[in-house]
C-alpha cells in the first residue's frame, strides 16, 4: 500500500492490506517525481483483505534501475558508506524537512539512498547503522530523477549481517570536456588544453 491520508492510521490499515477505492474526483500530481493522487474530499476506502499480502521483494542489482520500480517492494545487496556506520538510521539532528537520507553502496561502486521520513522516526531513531553488508529492503520512491528505497519497518533492515566488501573502482570513462554531463561520475580527459584568463592586477 501507499500512504493513505496524513498517516497510516487514518484508515486503520495493516501492512499488506488490499484496498479498493474510486479514483473519480482525484487528480494526479508529482511530488519530487513520485506519482501521487490527491482528493478534495477523503475517498471511501474498502478493505478487501486485511491480511498481510506483501509480495516477495524484487532484487535489483543496479541502483540506476530503481527508477523503474516506483512504489514497488525491492531489495538491494549493499552496505552503508563508511562515514555513517555507527550512526542511527534516523537522526533528527540531520533531518531536512523531516527526512533523513542515508547513502549505501553496492559491490560495483554504485550508490543509492535510503530515505526515512518522520513517520519512521519512532523505530528508525533507535537502530544503529551496522558495519555490515546484506540485503536492504523497502519501497521505491523517486526524488530528483533517482530511485530511493524507503524501508517499511525494522525488519527491512535485518539483512545487514554479512562482512563488508570492497567496492569495485570503475575505470574512468574517456571523453571530451563538452561531453561531461553527470556530476559525481569519473571521467578521463585526453589531450586537453586549459586556457586561463588573468583579470587581476599587480
Regions found by a protein language model. Give the residues of each.
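OB-fold nucleic-acid-binding modules
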Residues: 1-202
Amino acid at each position: 500500500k501507499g500512504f493513505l491520508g496524513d498517516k497510516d492510521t487514518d484508515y486503520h490499515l495493516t501492512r499488506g492490506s488490499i484496498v479498493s477505492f474510486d479514483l473519480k474526483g482525484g487528480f494526479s500530481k508529482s511530488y519530487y517525481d513520485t506519482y501521487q493522487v490527491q482528493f478534495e474530499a477523503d475517498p471511501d476506502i474498502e478493505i478487501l483483505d486485511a491480511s498481510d499480502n506483501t509480495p516477495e521483494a524484487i532484487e535489483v542489482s543496479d541502483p540506476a534501475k530503481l527508477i523503474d520500480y516506483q512504489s514497488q517492494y525491492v531489495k538491494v545487496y549493499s552496505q552503508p558508506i563508511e562515514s555513517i556506520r555507527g550512526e542511527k538510521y534516523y537522526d533528527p539532528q540531520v533531518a531536512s524537512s523531516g527526512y533523513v537520507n542515508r547513502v549505501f553502496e553496492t559491490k560495483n561502486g554504485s550508490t543509492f539512498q535510503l530515505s526515512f521520513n518522520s513517520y519512521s522516526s519512532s523505530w528508525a531513531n533507535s537502530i544503529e547503522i551496522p558495519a555490515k553488508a546484506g540485503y536492504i529492503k523497502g519501497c521505491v520512491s523517486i526524488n530528483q530523477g533517482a530511485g530511493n528505497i524507503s524501508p517499511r519497518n525494522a525488519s527491512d533492515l535485518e539483512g545487514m549481517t554479512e562482512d563488508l566488501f570492497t567496492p569495485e573502482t570503475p575505470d574512468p570513462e574517456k571523453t571530451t570536456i563538452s561531453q561531461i554531463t553527470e556530476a559525481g561520475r569519473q571521467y578521463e580527459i585526453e589531450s586537453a588544453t586549459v586556457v586561463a584568463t588573468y583579470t587581476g592586477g599587480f
